[in-house]
């Protein structure tokens, strides 16, 4: 198991792909710090880990608040002394809304969580990885296939995910001098509470509604383990993992 003795942090670890990634990293031997708003949801994730639960720490964290992120990393520093892997996963969305009907409050909410929160956590991880001995680590940002091709009515979400792509490239570039690698996983239709609506049908670019296939979220966990376990001389800069038959290529 490549993760033995290594410390990983997963944000948004209480459900969905964050939960899948947490459990996969634990199975690989990592010690995992879970961060999220809901302590009860994170404890539920830990309850699924069996004997691996002994290698977990759950920290209630609002990633949009700088003080909360600082407190999270101080706790990691105090308890473990270092951080080897970050899965920067926390995110959210608003209901599908035509761009002309979107309010600034909706826009700001998505930007605060998906972009500002991602920055705050990645920035704190970068600083910790730069200062620790041995130096370095790996940051994995959760992008989306919306970082490539938008859905109808998803301007805020799509804009933030395109921005994450730019931030991933910048972190990867700036991190070279400190042995900090940064990659991005772009996920399409993992079966989670966030994608439950796919079974009821979602708007398509041609104006129709279509039921879309999903994939087991465990596929995301396996991909995170692969990305996290690469040698320091390699980086999976961008990885797309999606339901095989979902509309994506041309959104058709």
What role is predicted for each listed range?
Residues 28-44:
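Conserved glycine-rich Rossmann-like NAD(P)H-binding loop of the short-chain dehydrogenase/reductase
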Residues 60-71, 104:
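The beta1-alpha1 cofactor-binding region of Rossmann-like NAD(H)/NADP(H)-dependent oxidoreductases
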Residues 122, 160:
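Active-site helix of classical SDR
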Residues 144:
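Residue(s) in the substrate-gating loop at a strand-loop-helix junction
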